[in-house]
């Protein structure tokens, strides 16, 4: 897709996020909106996936570590054709399969249930390790929040991923510097994020997470990186 096509798709996803959260009268629109361009590039350009066969064995995997931004993931999956866009207005409604956090048992295209912050990277690392063990070519992507990486489990997983040289793993950090309690750097600063991942043997790329030229270049660089996992620190607007 061209950048213009990606931008148009991302804007459609943003519209769906607002519609879904408005229908639910609750949810997390901010982090969903800040991640929209990342979601768009992953699902429409980067990942090897098939909406008609969501459990395809050799598909690339995605783990939404910051599971509270489910409206962003759901809107992307619907736009990509995993389920009808009309279902988005049932977000968080009683009886809907689209609840407040992703559920791998009920939502097509969701590879892992998530929501408890800090745990998604560990799951993604496990998936990547299994891929290496089984000699598979699939890649594993996970999206974390900059507030989420205040959780210690993130760094345990990062240490192991770097030690095992999981070059089939890409961690994207949505660096919007906002969490519920305030500015991330004032609540409990994780900065400099890039230096921390580098210390655990990650290849680190800093980008504007709302610029498709930079997003495209970063994922290309990640694919070309061998012998270590990649962390993309994406500065976004929330």
Task: List PLM regions with ranges.
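Glycine-rich ThDP/TPP pyrophosphate-binding loop and its adjacent helix/strand module
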Residues: 49-61, 103-238
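Thiamine diphosphate
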Residues: 1-141, 202, 206
